[in-house]
C-alpha cells in the first residue's frame, strides 16, 4: 500500500526531523507496526507567473512588491521581464526596487514574440537564515 500526502498537507509539515508510525490491522485482528523517520529540509522556493501578463505596448516601467519573512542570512531575488512571451525572456533583477517599493524602468527594448507581456519570478533561499523564511505575496503593476 502507499501513503500519500496532499501538496497542501506536505506544505504544513515544518522543516526538521519527523517520525511516522503506521499500524495495520488485518481481518483476524493481528497488527503490524512500522515506524519511519524522515527529515524535511526545504531550502528554497521559486514563484513565477506561468503565462505572460498581456501588454498592448512595450512596458517601460513597473512597481513590484514582495511580502514575507526574510531573515538575515537568506537570499531573495526578484526578477521581471517585459518580453515574457519570448522563448528566452530577458530577465531583469529588481530585488532592491521590490523590497523598497520603488519604480523600476525596464532596460530591455526588444522582443521576438508577436506581443509584449510581463512575467515576474521571485526566488527565496534560506541560506544561513534561521526562523520563519517565506514569501506570502507578490503584487505590482506595469505600464
Mark where each language-model region is.
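Strand-loop-strand motifs at the edges of beta-sheets in extracellular beta-sandwich domains
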Residues: 1-8
Amino acid at each position: 500500500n502507499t501513503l500519500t500526502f496532499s501538496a497542501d498537507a506536505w506544505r504544513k509539515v515544518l522543516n526538521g526531523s519527523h517520525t511516522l508510525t503506521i499500524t495495520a490491522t488485518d481481518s483476524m485482528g493481528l497488527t503490524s507496526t512500522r515506524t519511519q523517520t524522515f527529515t524535511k529540509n526545504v531550502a528554497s522556493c521559486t514563484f513565477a507567473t506561468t503565462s505572460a501578463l498581456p501588454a498592448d505596448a512595450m512596458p517601460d516601467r513597473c512597481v513590484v512588491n514582495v511580502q514575507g519573512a526574510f531573515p538575515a542570512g537568506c537570499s531573495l531575488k526578484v526578477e521581471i521581464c517585459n518580453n515574457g512571451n519570448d522563448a528566452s525572456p530577458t530577465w531583469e533583477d529588481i530585488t532592491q526596487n521590490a523590497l523598497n517599493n520603488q519604480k523600476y524602468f525596464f532596460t530591455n527594448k526588444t522582443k521576438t514574440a508577436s506581443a509584449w507581456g510581463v512575467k515576474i519570478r521571485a526566488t527565496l533561499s534560506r541560506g544561513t537564515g534561521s526562523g520563519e523564511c517565506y514569501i506570502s505575496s507578490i503584487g505590482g503593476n506595469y505600464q
